[in-house]
């Protein structure tokens, strides 16, 4: 389980932009589970960001067959992206993804306050 006391990883957005993350990239957890494929980013207003409350700036929407719908991974929890293998790894196990409730749409997205950014 990810706790408020766990260190917050660095935001992966600069790395993802540099490596040009593509739509339908395969997404895996640290324990090797196939989470799904990438769809788009959603950005939160900078004024509303508070990592201690788990209110992150950018989320990556992943279409997951394993979890039965969309999963919203905070960009801080992207571990690595290998464009040659078309593979992105999330810095969490499948159990941690489930425990963190990332399979629930964040409130700011549900209310239409998120800014979507389609992946190429």
List PLM regions with ranges:
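Peripheral interaction segments used for macromolecular assembly
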Residues: 1-120
């Amino acid at each position: 389980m990810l706790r408020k006391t766990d260190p917050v990883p660095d935001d992966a957005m600069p790395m993802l932009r540099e490596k040009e993350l593509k739509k339908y990239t395969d997404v895996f957890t640290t324990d090797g589970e196939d989470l799904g494929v990438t769809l788009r980013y959603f950005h939160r207003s900078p004024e509303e960001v508070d990592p201690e409350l788990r209110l992150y700036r950018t989320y990556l929407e992943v279409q997951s067959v394993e979890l039965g719908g969309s999963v919203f991974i905070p960009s801080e929890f992207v571990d690595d992206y290998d464009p040659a293998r078309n593979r992105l790894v999330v810095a969490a196990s499948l159990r941690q993804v489930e425990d963190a409730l990332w399979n629930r749409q964040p409130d700011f997205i549900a209310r239409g306050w998120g800014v979507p950014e389609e992946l190429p």
